[in-house]
């Protein structure tokens, strides 16, 4: 039996530069992790089946689940003769912009690597994971990083300054592909990647908060205005900075003082079912 944790990610920045020939967008984003985790357990099977056990019936346990697909890919890649049972204890909200599925897939690749004593490097696992999800390479490492290309090119950055994170997911789900289809690259939107990069380099918390920016945010807000209301609520309640993560709908706020963080948590707790008070990891 092997255990792995799969932490959620948040975007400090997210920019799309151009549409690639392969249909994907060229992206440039800075991400980090927070201490909201899914927990996964892996058991070898006597047959060759892949079985995903998960309590929530709204999360698929078949090939639509990224952890299942990661296991399938790993077993094919290393020509394994045994299957695996994957038990997932989910804490990360689903379809939230927090890369919960990608985190589970990355944890599966790391877990099976240990379970079957394959000895693959993290670089090899990241390359393998990139075949099924653009956030998976980042989730293999779980470090603060600048991700470019489709998300597979990773430059590790300094850990962010210590801070509380208030995560709040409105009662809706958003499909990333649907949001990416609506990107208008002719429309100017300033994403402060360079400022964020320098803020992390200098461990400058105030500059980090000022740099938070996400090109997808206005697109998701145009379809779901409650995202913007939630963000403004956090800022009015004392957040040093706030942003929608990924394609949304989760919004997070940053705070350095615990009392400040609890005030923000209480302010948004009434309007969302899923609100979490966590810490930056990076």
UniProtKB/Swiss-Prot annotation:
EC top class named in words: transferase
Keywords of the record: ATP-binding, Kinase, Nucleotide-binding, Transferase
Record Pfam families: GHMP_kinases_C, GHMP_kinases_N
Gene Ontology process terms (BP): terpenoid biosynthetic process
Protein name: Putative 4-diphosphocytidyl-2-C-methyl-D-erythritol kinase
Source organism: Staphylococcus aureus (strain MRSA252)
EC number in record: 2.7.1.148
Binding site for ATP: 93-103
Catalysis: reaction(s): 4-CDP-2-C-methyl-D-erythritol + ATP = 4-CDP-2-C-methyl-D-erythritol 2-phosphate + ADP + H(+)
Active site positions, chain numbering: 9, 135
Entry function: Catalyzes the phosphorylation of the position 2 hydroxy group of 4-diphosphocytidyl-2C-methyl-D-erythritol.
Gene3D superfamilies for the chain: 3.30.230.10, GHMP kinase, C-terminal domain (3.30.70.890)
Family the UniProt entry places it in: Belongs to the GHMP kinase family. IspE subfamily.
InterPro entries: GHMP_kinase_C_dom, GHMP_kinase_C_sf, GHMP_kinase_N_dom, IspE, Ribosomal_Su5_D2-typ_SF, Ribsml_uS5_D2-typ_fold_subgr
Residues of the signal peptide: none
GO MF terms, alphabetically ordered: 4-(cytidine 5'-diphospho)-2-C-methyl-D-erythritol kinase activity; ATP binding
């Amino acid at each position: 039996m092997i255990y792995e944790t799969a932490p959620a990610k948040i975007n400090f920045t997210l920019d799309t530069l151009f549409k690639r020939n392969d249909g994907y967008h060229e992206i440039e984003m800075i991400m980090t992790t927070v201490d909201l985790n899914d927990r996964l357990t892996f058991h070898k099977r006597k047959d060759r089946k892949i079985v995903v056990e998960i309590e929530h019936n709204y999360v698929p346990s078949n090939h639509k689940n990224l952890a299942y697909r990661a296991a399938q890919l790993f077993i094919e890649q290393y020509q394994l003769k045994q299957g695996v049972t994957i038990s997932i204890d989910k804490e990360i909200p689903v379809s939230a912009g927090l890369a919960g599925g990608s985190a589970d897939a990355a944890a599966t690749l790391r877990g099976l690597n240990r379970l079957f004593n394959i000895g693959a490097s993290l670089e090899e696992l990241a390359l393998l994971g990139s075949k099924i999800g653009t956030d998976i390479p980042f989730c293999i490492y779980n470090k603060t990083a600048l991700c470019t290309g489709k998300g597979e090119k990773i430059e590790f950055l300094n850990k962010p300054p210590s801070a509380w994170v208030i995560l709040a997911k409105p009662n809706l789900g958003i499909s990333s592909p649907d949001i990416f289809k609506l990107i208008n690259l002719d429309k100017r939107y300033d994403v402060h990647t360079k400022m964020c990069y320098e803020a992390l380099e200098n461990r400058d918390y105030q500059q980090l908060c000022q740099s938070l920016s996400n090109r997808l945010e206005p697109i998701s807000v145009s379809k779901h205005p409650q995202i913007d209301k939630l963000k403004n609520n956090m800022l009015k309640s004392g957040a040093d900075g706030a942003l929608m993560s990924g394609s949304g709908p989760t919004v997070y706020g940053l705070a350095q003082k615990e009392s400040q963080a609890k005030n923000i948590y209480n302010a948004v707790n009434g309007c969302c079912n899923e609100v979490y008070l966590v810490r930056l990891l990076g």
